[in-house]
Amino acid sequence: MERVRGASSSDSVATLHGDHNYHCMATFKLDCTSARTRGVVSILEHRDPATVDDIFMQRVCHDINDVLRPVECLTSFPEYRRTLRVAVEAATELHGVSALSGQLTKFLEDHDGAMLPLAWPPNRYLRLTSGRKLGYLDVAEKLRKEYPMCNGPLEVLGVILGPGQSLYSDQHPVLLMGLTGTIFLHARGRPVWSPDYDPERDADRLFLAAESLQSFGREGLCRCDNVYTEDGGAPYATPEDPVLKNIVFTPHLGGKALHQQICKIKGHTWYLNGCPGMLKDRVFVATPDIPPFVRHVNLELFGHRFLPIGRVTRSPEDPECEMFIMVDAGGAIYGHMLDSGKVRRLADNFDQFMRMGTRRVISISRWLREVVSTPSTRRPRLGPRTTGSFS
């Protein structure tokens, strides 16, 4: 995997306190954009955040409803559109083979060297090979022991390569599949004896790439959340604290219960992950308070379907709100976009929201239009039938 040396720590501090320009990457970089990785990426292009956000919101979900990561933010979106169909077909075929007991390893060895295109990033391929041929069986076993969330043995699927790259370089990431079908990416670390070795950036890391091979086919590597060993893994942008643990570890946390907990911790803040390849961290401020006009719009359009639980800002010191965060009765998280007035589904629950931030944006403008033209006694359904409302 290509490694890009980053900016100084002073630049990172400057970014933390107000420099929120996007730093778009042309290189293949898999670090999540949390506070841990500010200043690490190559500064190849500067964009106004408002412009990029606007383009993202215009493009998202217009044609590809299932691809909900921030692929649309990236400069490679046209290439992604062209590659998507082939990538999905290849991943679907591989998924079919993996469902046959004991056949996956044989398939990988029979098709050793086959190159399957990734949906993202552009010009990257999964070069099929087995753990035995790659000499990776011991490494896979070591990862299984170090990362409890892997939950069983890991099967090597292949190596991520670009055009003309050699299989035998130890810098290329290795794709693995867990026992339950979860896809992981192992970024092999640089040798510790390298002159400029940095343990924070150059140690080997494990990423959660996708929940399944089907998701991997649609998304490629645009997710790649960090995986940690503590408590079986927690890819949050902010360190876990007792308040966060108390919320996310509460079983069957519904919307009303979450709203009540938010009321108790009013003003608490956490960092949220931004888009892969961009310095776009955001801060979630837990608060049940929203301006009267926002409350009025929500009541007018949705009745008592949502309860406010907070807002998203650019930094802890920045009072300007980018998005108000709401929860429905089933615990799903929604964002009210102030610039467009749209309400978009962000996550299935609060834990997922804390992991994904505002990266996963599902447009519900279709239902929004239906609400406007539908009598208040027949409001359209915005989620699972079990969601209900707070009335």
UniProtKB/Swiss-Prot annotation:
Query: Where on the tree of life does the source sit, at the highest rank?
Result: Viruses
Task: Give one GO biological process term.
Answer: symbiont-mediated perturbation of host cell cycle G0/G1 transition checkpoint
Main localization is host cell
Give the record's keywords alphabetically. Answer: Early protein, G0/G1 host cell cycle checkpoint dysregulation by virus, Host cytoplasm, Host nucleus, Host-virus interaction, Modulation of host cell cycle by virus
The yes or no answer to whether the keyword Heme is present is no
Q: Name one GO cellular component term.
A: host cell cytoplasm
* Pfam families the UniProt entry points to: US22 (PF02393)
State whether keyword Hydrolase applies. no
Q: Where in the cell is it found?
A: Host cytoplasm; Host nucleus
Which residue ranges does UniProt annotate as crossing the membrane?
Answer: none
User: Which family is annotated?
Assistant: Belongs to the herpesviridae US22 family.
Q: What does this protein do?
A: Involved in the reactivation of latent MCMV in spleen cells.
Q: What is this protein called?
A: Immediate-early protein 2
Give the organism, scientific name: Murid herpesvirus 1 (strain Smith) (MuHV-1)
Quick one: which gene encodes this? IE2
